[in-house]
Amino acid sequence: MPLRFLLFVVLLLSTLSTMKANAAQPNEIAAQPNEIAAKVDSIMRRMSLQERVAQLFVVHFVSKHPRRVKELQNRLIKRGLGGVILMDDKLLPSLERINAMNALAKIPLLVTLDGEWGAQMRYWTEIPAFPKQMQLGSIKDRKMIYRAGYAIGKECKDLGFQVNYAPDVDVNNNPDNPVIHYRSFGEDPQKVALYGALFMQGMQDAGTSACAKHFPGHGDTDVDSHKSLPVLPFDIKRLEEVELLPFKYLIEKGVDLVMLGHLQVKAMDSTGTISSLSYPIITDWLKNKLGFEGVICTDALEMKGVAVESGLPQSRIPLEAFKAGVDILLMPNEVEASIKQIVHAVRRGEISKERLNESVRKILMLKAKRGLLGRGKEELRIDTTGINKRVIRPENLALIDSLANQSLIMAWNSRRNQLGKSTMINQRALPLKHWRYGKVAYLGYVGEGRIVQKLEGSVKSNVENFEHFYNTLKELNNGSQSPFQLDSILLRGTITAEMLSSALDSLQGYDCIIVGIHNALNSPAKNFGINDEHMRLLARRARTQNISVVWFGTPYVLNKVPFYKDFASFIIAHSNADFNNRAAARIVYGEVEPCGVMPVSAGDQKAYKEDYNL
């Protein structure tokens, strides 16, 4: 064998070996299972009973009462608290608190986040949002789902989170669901399973543990478990074909955690015990029948679906959840009393030490997998230098815009045969660039909204995002060879039919009117923010005026506006987020082709389906 070829083979093998080692670094367990297991065993031998029990708890701290918070967190740290969940707080103080707590902790804390569309879900004035899951369910290109999961996972890891309680793999086949809805990938169980797995794999490849929720399935309910107890009245065959299918698939694909919902499912537990407290649902089904060996956590135990509906004392609820097979007890109401309850239960033999050690070992192995064990205090510190600028990544902003471009739905686009004005015969009403229009008007339907963005010192209300639509449309028009006259009217706050009618009267001479409805709501109980009188008024005017509608809200709008084909065009833009406003303008003008599909059935349109080959 020639020497040069031999050297090439040696170098190639060396390179492949290095690549394999580097690729294995994010998953320490897979790379060095014996060493990690020995490390975990060594830690467990030094832990007291109270410290082992405290490892089961993940709690929530807020900054409203700093002295009391500090006293409580210090007491819990001394007891060996397992982890924290950060939500509804300010980013920098949150991360500084984690650094302070880890400086005191014998075992590093598992830092977790409930961030289905990224950290912005909890730090909503400081970090750009990604599209919500139902919007991702409108994208046909599966690679984009993985990319979204990877970007969110990387964002979480860079901010110091080891676990993100996402994705939501509930199958939303109930349009009246008040709490899942836009958090689901859609109504097709196979699509929810595949997209959930792609999102999960992206997150975990980026170094953040994912969590499939809310087992055994919260999609086909019309009750919010934050407020009461939803009931799934279905038989086992239906549950296995719909609700359980995504969980089974994500378990097969290696999801790190599964979260239990607070639900009543008598087909799985004939006693009607709440799912988060049910041995048959957790141990018999999730562990034994579905074969899940990862970490099982509850949904927040402070939610009324279990805190009130169980009828148990608050400190007893975590004990019952643990006895049923749970590993992580999330956000109980009485943490210290709950720890004591489980300690006493172990001492009196109600819970075996083996059962306790099983959960503690799983939690410590998860911490090892995410690089928490065997690191010094300084290595564990989250770098907060320039954090507010670091969370606004140009590559994430570009990805978010791409996701929006691919997800908006052209629900209706009529054919219009106007020779002399169109560049094509029998042309669709949109895009605008194919028409020789003289005057186009944008009529913005804007409500009152809360602040949703505070980036680089500028405060934005969510309703002000209409500016992104209008400005993008204006830029595209101004950059064309034959721009049309573009004017705008904004209807703000409490809008009457008279105000709307007057605005339309003033636009009688315009070739085309684009109506942007920016004040949509997510609540089915509030009719998704739809004013039926106003929509019918717009539809009547569309008989004599060329009116296209951009609905910045849910696809379920088609259930409420069955006459949407009375308009020249009807675009579903999912939400009034800034990125959706920009994408809508690109589609209206013709810079981007509309390619989003229906993730759910609504009106006369069925959810998009294909063979996902699961």
Each model region followed by its residue ranges:
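Preference for extracellular/luminal or secreted protein segments
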Residues: 25-59, 63-75, 288, 309-614
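Active-site mouth loops of central-metabolism enzymes
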Residues: 56-67, 133-146, 228-242, 304-312
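Short acidic, glycine-rich surface-loop motifs adjacent to enzyme active sites
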Residues: 54, 73-91, 175, 250-273, ...
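Second-shell residues forming the walls of enzyme active-site clefts
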Residues: 48, 84, 92-109, 119-121, ...
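Active-site-adjacent structural elements in enzyme catalytic domains
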Residues: 91-110, 140-158, 356, 361, ...
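Short glycine-enriched loops at secondary-structure junctions
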Residues: 61-65, 113-122, 162-172, 212-218, ...
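Catalytic domains of carbohydrate-active enzymes, especially glycoside hydrolases
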Residues: 71-87, 150-164
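Bacterial Sec-dependent N-terminal signal peptides
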Residues: 1-26, 31
